[in-house]
């Protein structure tokens, strides 16, 4: 849940930063041209933030669904979806950093949190797979 809260706050922060951005200009053949017009910049940030917002909040939602699963198959499915979303969040965080929307300190902090979630979920999913395999061996 705490990771989802961080993602929401980061989303709000980045969108506010983008909304306050000023265009940068360069001169080409004596004409002043906007290198990165604000609407284009704002749209880029919004798209990336939206992707992180979706994957980052989906981790907690799927984890809650797994915790309250109605069957073992449902628990397994939701756990693996949560892992997939956590890995996707790492991708979006990395992309935001590589494109200059997150500074090194912001990146390292939230990336470490997402990585920790991935490790926890990998452990859970491995355990689920081992239990499933053990039950299949018992049936034989």
Model-derived features: where do they sit?
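Short, C-terminally biased terminal segments at protein or domain edges
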Residues: 1-65, 69-140
């Amino acid at each position: 849940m705490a990771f989802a809260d961080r993602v929401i706050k980061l989303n709000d922060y980045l969108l506010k930063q983008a909304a306050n951005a000023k265009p940068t200009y360069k001169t080409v053949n004596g004409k002043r041209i906007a290198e990165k017009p604000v609407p284009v910049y704002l749209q880029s940030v919004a798209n990336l933030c939206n992707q992180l917002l979706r994957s980052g909040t989906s981790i907690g939602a799927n984890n809650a669904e797994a915790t309250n699963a109605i069957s073992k198959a449902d628990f397994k499915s939701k756990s693996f979806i949560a892992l997939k979303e956590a890995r996707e969040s790492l991708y979006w965080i990395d992309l935001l950093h590589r494109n200059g929307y997150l500074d090194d300190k912001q990146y390292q902090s939230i990336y470490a949190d997402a990585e920790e979630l991935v490790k926890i979920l990998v452990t859970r999913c491995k355990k689920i797979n081992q239990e499933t395999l053990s039950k299949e061996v018992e049936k034989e």
